[in-house]
Amino acid sequence: MDRNFLLTVTLICIVVAGVGGQSPISSPTKSPTTPSAPTTSPTKSPAVTSPTTAPAKTPTASASSPVESPKSPAPVSESSPPPTPVPESSPPVPAPMVSSPVSSPPVPAPVADSPPAPVAAPVADVPAPAPSKHKKTTKKSKKHQAAPAPAPELLGPPAPPTESPGPNSDAFSPGPSADDQSGAASTRVLRNVAVGAVATAWAVLVMAF
């Protein structure tokens, strides 16, 4: 352990001496950091105190920085062309005034003569007809006349048309003016009478209640 420590210390001294012998311009401003030597010893061996050597300080030589020369200003060209004069714009020519045509007054339209209104002819007074006594009597008779009861013949079928052909001599059926021998007409009349009686009885019952 002592030999290793001494070797490291001598190497550090050699490096410091080599760095100090360099030129001040190319020498670095800061010295390189030296690795620290191990100071711990094994537990069994007695602790050996090694002399601590202070590292030599490198002389900080002020590097002479070159002085920069001031920059010369760019030459200003004195012969600059004069500014071109701006041409003055002539005033605008006023537009000629167009005289508007004088409007003549409108010609009045001729008024058409309206035809005279027709004069209404006088209406002749027509004498009112005198009331007749016959009309009064008919009105009174109509008021007092009662409505006739419906006949049983009205409830039956309508009569045959008048334009039906008359009976021929060859026809076997009797004509309408001949007597009905079959009895169908009598049954029809009886049926009509029965229907009329039922209708009147029904009307009487309705009026009673």
Swiss-Prot record:
Q: Which UniProt keywords apply?
A: Cell membrane, Glycoprotein, GPI-anchor, Lipoprotein, Membrane, Proteoglycan, Signal
Q: Locations of Pro residues compositional bias?
A: 80-95, 103-119, 149-164
The PTM entry states: O-glycosylated on the hydroxyproline residues.
Tissue-by-tissue expression: Predominantly expressed in flowers, and moderately expressed in roots, stems and young leaves.
Compartments it resides in: Cell membrane
Region of interest (Disordered), residue spans: 21-185
Which InterPro entries does this entry report, sorted A to Z?
A: AGP9/17/18
GO biological processes: megasporogenesis
Query: Which positions make up the signal peptide?
Result: 1-21
Query: Where does this chain mainly localize?
Result: membrane
Compositional bias annotation for Basic residues: 132-145
Which positions anchor the lipid (GPI-anchor amidated glycine)? 183
Low complexity composition-biased segments: 23-79
**Function noted in UniProt:** Proteoglycan that seems to be implicated in diverse developmental roles such as differentiation, cell-cell recognition, embryogenesis and programmed cell death.
The UniProt family comment states:
Belongs to the lysine-rich AGP family.
According to UniProt, the name of this protein is: Lysine-rich arabinogalactan protein 18
Origin organism is Arabidopsis thaliana (Mouse-ear cress)
